[in-house]
């Protein structure tokens, strides 16, 4: 039977991507050494950001070495991991004759490690050659254990990784790679490792989770197997983020955010993302600002922009966010979702806009170092910057999943409000 082209959905065939084996819960990090030994690790490259001196790296290194596994440390990963971080780590891996990788930290550590694995498997080719879908030709790359110290990334459970191309600093580019060869061998999420995460960082990472859950729920992919996890992760964030921020040793809150992170990662792994992430990638490409913070500032603006295309789904998000929508119309409930997101961001101390962001608000994140030294001291809202960010959004791999059509012209007011506007 012939099918008219206009009868075919945007994504008629959808693909479900696998998850790694995972250890979730209190005390999971205690057995990292045993797990590394059982996986056959002999000499491992440990990749991390600024966590050295926090006690976490020292503790986990001790557990690994106790099982007879040698550790080579690469602790120069920057936030929004750069191409040169990946290439340096891959070179060190070869130089030190390592046989495996362990990443400890958030998405930056995990994504840099994924990138290093790809480079190692392809004889040192430049990581920027692997942007996009399934670019690996050699799927046999080093085994990888990812240990999360934040509830945000979801990288430890997904097939995606994000790298910043710094080859042209006049036109920096933050890109996404989707490759099942980079799925980690083992993910470890232990809420005890979140206790020392600073308040503001907990808030930023929590909004990363909210974006990871909400975007596949309204995505143009409309991938049914992801919808339940997506909605439940939003509910968990609304329930636990405030307590996790203001009561950092509240185990129930930290565990709730751990679960939210993991299942949101499962949701977007196949359900896709949207322009909350596209805006975030663009802003950090130019200014090296924190990914979770970028998501937090962009999210209410994007929800408002997308409402006309997904009123019913946003109304359901309002309920997940704790809003009593029983006496509201669908449109009113959808509007209430945006208001709930704004209220949550204000409650946990998210800046109103990007112009209020300052680099000195970060600690142990390796922001604005290397080629980005001084870039994020002020996020500019001039016409040139707004246009550059809006154009970057157009080329982002997350943009096609957005439920509402996106153009440069339609993004200029959204980006402008995110930089200078207030609610």
From Swiss-Prot:
<dbReference type="InterPro" id="IPR039697">
    <property type="entry name" value="Alcohol_dehydrogenase_Fe"/>
</dbReference>
<dbReference type="InterPro" id="IPR001670">
    <property type="entry name" value="ADH_Fe/GldA"/>
</dbReference>
<dbReference type="GO" id="GO:0008270">
    <property type="term" value="F:zinc ion binding"/>
</dbReference>
<dbReference type="GO" id="GO:0015946">
    <property type="term" value="P:methanol oxidation"/>
</dbReference>
<dbReference type="GO" id="GO:0000287">
    <property type="term" value="F:magnesium ion binding"/>
</dbReference>
<keyword id="KW-0560">Oxidoreductase</keyword>
<dbReference type="Pfam" id="PF00465">
    <property type="entry name" value="Fe-ADH"/>
</dbReference>
<comment type="function">
    <text>Catalyzes the oxidation of methanol to yield formaldehyde. While the in vivo electron acceptor is not known, N,N-dimethyl-4-nitrosoaniline (NDMA) can serve this function in vitro and is reduced to 4-(hydroxylamino)-N,N-dimethylaniline. It is also able to use ethanol and formaldehyde with an activity comparable to methanol, and has a weak activity with methylamine as substrate.</text>
</comment>
<dbReference type="GO" id="GO:0004022">
    <property type="term" value="F:alcohol dehydrogenase (NAD+) activity"/>
</dbReference>
<dbReference type="InterPro" id="IPR056798">
    <property type="entry name" value="ADH_Fe_C"/>
</dbReference>
<dbReference type="GO" id="GO:0016491">
    <property type="term" value="F:oxidoreductase activity"/>
</dbReference>
<protein>
    <recommendedName>
        <fullName>Methanol:N,N-dimethyl-4-nitrosoaniline oxidoreductase</fullName>
        <ecNumber>1.1.99.37</ecNumber>
    </recommendedName>
</protein>
<keyword id="KW-0460">Magnesium</keyword>
<dbReference type="GO" id="GO:0070402">
    <property type="term" value="F:NADPH binding"/>
</dbReference>
<dbReference type="Pfam" id="PF25137">
    <property type="entry name" value="ADH_Fe_C"/>
</dbReference>
<comment type="subunit">
    <text>Homodecamer.</text>
</comment>
<keyword id="KW-0521">NADP</keyword>
<keyword id="KW-0862">Zinc</keyword>
<keyword id="KW-0485">Methanol utilization</keyword>
<dbReference type="InterPro" id="IPR026338">
    <property type="entry name" value="NDMA_methanol_DH"/>
</dbReference>
<comment type="similarity">
    <text>Belongs to the iron-containing alcohol dehydrogenase family.</text>
</comment>
């Amino acid at each position: 039977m012939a099918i008219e082209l206009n009868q075919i959905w945007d994504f008629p065939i959808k693909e479900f991507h696998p998850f790694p084996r995972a250890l979730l819960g209190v005390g999971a990090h205690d057995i990292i050494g045993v797990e590394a030994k059982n996986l056959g690790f002999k000499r491992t490259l440990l990749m991390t950001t600024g966590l050295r001196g926090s006690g976490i790296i020292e503790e986990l290194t001790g557990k690994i070495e106790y099982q007879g596994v040698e550790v080579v440390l690469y602790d120069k990963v920057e936030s929004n991991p750069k191409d040169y971080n990946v290439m340096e780590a891959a070179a060190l891996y070869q130089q030190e004759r390592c046989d495996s990788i362990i990443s400890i930290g958030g998405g930056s550590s995990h994504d840099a490690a994924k990138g290093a694995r790809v480079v190692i498997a392809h004889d040192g080719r430049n990581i920027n050659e692997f942007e996009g879908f399934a670019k690996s030709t050699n799927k046999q790359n080093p085994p990888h254990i990812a240990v999360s110290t934040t509830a945000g990334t979801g990288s430890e459970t997904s097939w995606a990784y994000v790298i910043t191309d710094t080859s042209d600093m006049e036109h920096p580019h933050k890109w996404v790679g989707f490759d099942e060869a980079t799925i980690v061998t083992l993910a470890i999420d232990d809420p005890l490792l979140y206790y020392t995460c600073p308040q503001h960082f907990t808030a930023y990472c929590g909004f990363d989770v909210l974006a990871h859950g909400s975007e596949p729920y309204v995505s143009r992919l409309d991938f049914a197997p992801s919808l339940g996890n997506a909605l439940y992760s939003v509910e968990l964030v609304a329930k636990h983020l405030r307590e996790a921020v203001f009561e950092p040793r509240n185990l129930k809150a930290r565990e709730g955010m751990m679960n939210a992170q993991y299942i949101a990662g499962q949701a977007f792994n196949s359900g896709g993302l949207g322009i909350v992430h596209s805006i975030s990638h663009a802003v950090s490409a130019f200014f090296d600002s924190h990914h979770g913070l970028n998501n937090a500032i962009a999210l209410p603006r994007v929800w408002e922009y997308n409402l006309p295309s997904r009123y019913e789904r946003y109304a359901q998000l309002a309920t997940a966010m704790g809003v009593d929508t029983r006496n509201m119309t669908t449109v009113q409930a959808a509007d209430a979702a945006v208001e709930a997101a704004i209220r949550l961001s204000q409650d946990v101390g998210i800046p109103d806009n990007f112009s209020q962001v300052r680099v000195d608000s970060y600690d142990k994140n390796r922001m604005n170092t290397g080629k980005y030294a001084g870039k994020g001291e002020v996020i500019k809202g001039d016409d040139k910057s707004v246009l550059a960010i809006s154009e970057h959004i157009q080329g982002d791999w997350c943009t096609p999943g957005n439920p509402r059509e996106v153009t440069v012209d339609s993004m200029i007011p959204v980006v402008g409000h995110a930089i200078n506007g207030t609610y």
